[in-house]
Structure formats: structure tokens, C-alpha cells
Amino acid sequence: MYRENTKEIAIGNVKIGGTHPVTIQSMTNTKTENVKETVDQILRLEAAGCEIIRCAVPTMEAAEALKEIKKQIHIPLVADIHFDYRLAIAAIENGADKIRINPGNIGSEEKVQAVVDKAKEYNVPIRVGVNSGSLEKHILEKYNGVTAEGIVESALDKVHMIEKMGYDNLVVSIKSSDVLMCVKAHELIAKACPYPLHVGITESVSYTHLT
């Protein structure tokens, strides 16, 4: 199988991209503020082979909980941020090994710049995440709806914004609940930028739910 030679990125003590093997990441479904429940779930995931863990950070209390969670686990911790740039900054300050943001819902470029500056200070990678359900109006109009090309254009716009801010410690995530569209989008973006890709399917459900 052909593989793009992407930029090497360090997430804590785990390296991705370049010639490194694909790593397995999962996400907790606990309230991150509940340190014990979150740690217990992460340790079970570690035992099952998880190599990187992501936690939702919807509140400042959750951001502050990352510091204690980090002390009790053995794999890199990623903070999943939506809407409030201050949570991204707090997550980095409390030990997140990587943050996931969608610059399109963080707010103004000044707010994105504040997050980038903090990531630079701590040398923390940023995962730029875009999904098919959050495409900008002008992209939807240009491509007459949701398309792989539109998803890629939206993601590249955000990547280029952060590059212009002087930061390239990046991972890119593009997601769609349409599997074939998702595959095509990944093929397109792999040729368009040098960063490693986080591969996942949005709106995923359990097997028991499907049956």
C-alpha cells in the first residue's frame, strides 16, 4: 500500500506521521470533571491496546482535571475543544499533549492566534478538525452541497490560517458519516498537505445500536 511521507509529529511520547506505524486512539465518554471515572475508563482502554486517548473539555473544571488525569495514566492525552478558545489555552496549561479544535467554531482569528501562541509556548500539536456537518455556507454553495472536495477545501483553509500564524505542528482531521465521501476526502487531502491524518468516522454508533 502506498503511503504519503508526512511530517513527523510528537504527541507526548508517541510519534505519528513519517515512517511511524498507525496508532490507535479512542475517546472517553465520561464527564472529564470526574477524574476517577475518567481514569478508570482510560486504564481499561490502555489494557485493550489504546495508544492515545482523547477527552472532551467542555468546561474550565474539565480543563483543570486534565492535570490529575495525566498523573494516573500512561498514554498521551488529547483535549477535545469546541467553541471556547480559553478552554484550549487552559487544557494546554494543564498538560494536554495535543488539542483538537475546529478554528471555524473557536471564533475570531485573534482567538485562534491566542490558542496557537499557547501551543507554540508548550510545543503542543494542534489537530485541525473539520466535519461534513459544519462546512461554511460559501463552501456548500460553491460545491452545491456537501462533497469531498468541499470538506478538503474547508480543512485546508484552516490549516493555511494556522500556518500563516507561524505554526506547523499540526495534524489534520476530516470526517463525514458517508464512508465513501470520507475515503475520497482523505485521498485528496493526503496529496494537498504534508501533515499526518487522524482517520475516523463521525456519528459512529455501537454494533448493538445497529442491530
Regions found by a protein language model. Give the residues of each.
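N-terminal basic/disordered segments at the start of proteins
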Residues: 2-14
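N-terminal capping/lid subdomain adjacent to the active-site entrance of alpha/beta enzymes
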Residues: 3, 27-29
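Alpha/beta enzyme core
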Residues: 11, 16-23, 30-55, 60, ...
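Short beta-strand/loop segments at the ligand-binding rim of alpha/beta enzyme cores
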Residues: 70-79, 193-201
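Active-site phosphate/pyrophosphate-binding segments
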Residues: 203-205
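Conserved small/polar residues in nucleotide/adenosyl-binding loops
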Residues: 208-211
